[in-house]
Amino acid sequence: EYTMVVIKKLDDMKKMINKICLFLFIALIAVSCEDFPVDEDGLLITTRAECYVSNFDLYNTDHQTIKLGNAYVDTTAQVAIMYVKFGTPINNVWPRISLCEDAKLAPKITDWMDFSGSKMNMEFIEGDWKSGNPSDQLGERIVNNPSAFPSTAKRFTVIAGNREIKKEYIFLIVERPLQ
């Protein structure tokens, strides 16, 4: 009689486990049937409308950053400025452009690039540099004078996660003066 009770409980437990597994299997199928579209690059298309550059850096052929201080990114004016030491070669560098979540960049960065055309020539004023690093004042002065941007400056388009919003950013390089 005792073995019959144990066998009955084992049968009940098997049925319960089977029901749980069936429920989980059905739930998994229901979730996997949702349509998650992908773009031509195989990236997930989301509902995110954010579309901006959050950081900008350049690396030399030794894979070391050539950035001096912090890059200045103005998401309203769609301008990214990176500062380098005087005389730093910028003709064979690898850009690293950080974007908001789910966004992508066009054109894609697939090779070393020449950023010489993005170099700005400008006159500096008191307060542009603090302890050898660029100040926000300098970035704001540059952004507020778009007529001074080189016509050959690098341009990249940021495309939002929903793939509907596109914003073109201008990437500029400013050399710190000799000190």
Where is each model-derived feature located?
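Sec-dependent bacterial lipoprotein signal peptides
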Residues: 1-32
